[in-house]
Amino acid sequence: MNKSKRPFTKSKRSFRRRLPPIQSGDRIDYRNMSLISRFISEQGKILSRRVNRVTLKQQRLITIAIKQARILSLLPFLTNQKQFERSESTPRTTSLRTRKK
C-alpha cells in the first residue's frame, strides 16, 4: 500500500525505560531504612506494587520488611497525623423557626 493512502498513521515514538527502584545489589531488609522509606507514602502507608514498579516477590519482601520495622519501632505506624483545629463556629439563631403552610 502506498504511503499517501495512509493519512492517519502515527510514527512510533521512542521511550526511555525507567530504572528499577531496587537494584540487584540492594538487600530488602527491615534495617535498610533508606530503601524502605522509598516505598512508604507521606501518611506512612505502604505504596502499591503498580506505584512502586516492583515485582510481586519484591513487593512481598518490602511489605514484610516495613511491617517488621514498624513492630520494632524503627518506623511509625502513622505519620503526619491531622491536627484537628477548632474553626470559628457560626452562631445559632435564637428565633423560633416556623413552618410555612
From Swiss-Prot:
Location(s) in or outside the cell: Plastid, Chloroplast
InterPro entries in alphabetical order: Ribosomal_bS18, Ribosomal_bS18_CS, Ribosomal_bS18_sf
Keyword Ligase: no
Gene3D superfamilies: Ribosomal protein S18 (4.10.640.10)
GO CC terms of this entry: chloroplast; mitochondrial small ribosomal subunit
UniProt xrefs under PROSITE patterns: RIBOSOMAL_S18
GO biological process, one term: translation
Region (Disordered): 1-23
Cystine pairs: none
Pfam assignment, any one: Ribosomal_S18
Similarity comment text for this entry: Belongs to the bacterial ribosomal protein bS18 family.
Subunit relationships: Part of the 30S ribosomal subunit.
PANTHER family with a match to the protein in the record: 30S RIBOSOMAL PROTEIN S18 (PTHR13479), SMALL RIBOSOMAL SUBUNIT PROTEIN BS18M (PTHR13479:SF40)
The protein's name: Small ribosomal subunit protein bS18c
Originating organism: Lobularia maritima
